[in-house]
Amino acid sequence: MRFLLYDRVTSIDKGKSITGIKTFTLTEPFLDRHFSRKPLVPSVMFIETMAQLLGWLIIYSHDFQLTTFLSLIEGANVPPGLRPGFQAEVHAEIASTHSRDSLGRATLHVEGVQVACIERIIYGHFHKVDPHLLRRQFGYYSGLEEL
């Protein structure tokens, strides 16, 4: 994973929801030489952060027997950019999940105020995976020790 856009998972409820945090700092690789006078976190990074957490929730909820690929985002509301130096809390939930795809939604809050959301995210499922590898990756990337 080239850009892991969350720092850790703070809670997960199988088949239902996931919450995680991300601290956006001035030293983010995607800000390097991108903005000369007033660095701003690009809005697409908020979308990617929310999408990554929802993707892992789906994989976790299916017992690491599949991986996901993003197929649709609708109703995305994101800020035009925020200055680095803030911590975001991301919450994502599954609305429905089946063997072929999953539907979810996500929000991103800064200091308790919702600043971004995606009303509808659809992920397709890919079933030819190594469940043990996915479980190890999730344990490492999430910061959850019990996996």
Indicate residue ranges for each PLM-predicted region.
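Hydrophobic core residues within well-ordered beta-strands of beta-rich domains
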Residues: F3-L5, A88, S102
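Compact, glycine-rich, soluble single-domain proteins
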Residues: H34-P42, F46-G55, L70
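HotDog/MaoC-like acyl-thioester-processing domains
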Residues: P84, E93-L147
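Short, hydrophobic/aromatic-enriched beta-strand segments in well-ordered soluble domains
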Residues: K22, H91-I94
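A short, structured loop/turn motif at beta-sheet edges
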Residues: S11-S17, G81-P84, E111-V113
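A residue-level detector for short acidic-glycine micro-motifs
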Residues: R8-S11, G75, P80, I94-S96
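Hydrophobic beta-strand-centered segment that forms part of the acyl-chain substrate-binding groove
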Residues: L53-H91, C117-E119, Y123-G124
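Catalytic strand-loop segment that frames the active site of acyl-thioester-processing enzymes
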Residues: M1-V41
